[in-house]
């Protein structure tokens, strides 16, 4: 399989629904073979990793981690759907407040570990304010 680049791409929130779908899309489209799945929830990201290992993506080098330093170091591309989902009884403002903290940590990780990143795509809830 031919890829558009060999640079590292990190998928943040890879254990969630959007993130796990992005992994498959990235590999099916041949964007890069070097994909790191990152999520703070180890059982979720490990499950997605196991699923991807069962797929036929020749030449893919997929890794996973719950360590931000390992995930972000050397990344040139980042897709993040790592915001928290809305829970019962939460207002949009509650969700925004919680996801602002997550977004700040996300930005800090980029600054610390991959300041030369080329492209970052962020999808957080509430989606109309990110």
How does the language model describe each region?
Residues 19-20:
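N-terminal Rossmann-fold NAD(P) dinucleotide-binding loop
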Residues 15:
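Conserved glycine-rich cofactor-binding loop
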Residues 91-130:
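Rossmann-like NAD(P)(H) cofactor-binding subdomain of soluble oxidoreductases
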Residues 79-80, 122:
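Redox-cofactor binding/interface segments in oxidoreductases and associated redox assembly factors
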Residues 6, 31-75, 84:
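Conserved N-terminal Rossmann-fold NAD(P) cofactor-binding segment
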Residues 26:
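Aromatic pocket-lining residues of Rossmann-like dinucleotide-binding sites
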Residues 8-9, 120:
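Conserved hydrophobic helix-helix packing surfaces used for dimerization/oligomerization
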Residues 82-83, 125:
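Short glycine-/small-residue-rich Rossmann-like dinucleotide-binding loops
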């Amino acid at each position: 399989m031919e890829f558009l680049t060999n640079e590292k791409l990190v998928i943040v929130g890879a254990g969630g629904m959007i993130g796990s779908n992005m992994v498959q899309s990235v590999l099916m489209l041949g964007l890069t073979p070097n994909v790191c799945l990152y999520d703070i929830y180890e059982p979720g990201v490990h499950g997605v990793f196991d699923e991807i290992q069962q797929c036929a993506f020749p030449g893919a080098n997929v890794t996973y981690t719950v360590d931000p330093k390992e995930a972000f170091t050397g990344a040139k591309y980042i897709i993040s759907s790592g915001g928290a989902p809305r829970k019962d009884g939460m207002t949009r403002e509650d969700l925004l407040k919680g996801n602002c903290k997550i977004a700040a940590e996300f930005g800090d990780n980029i600054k610390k570990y991959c300041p030369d990143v080329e492209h970052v795509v962020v999808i957080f809830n509430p989606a109309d304010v990110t």
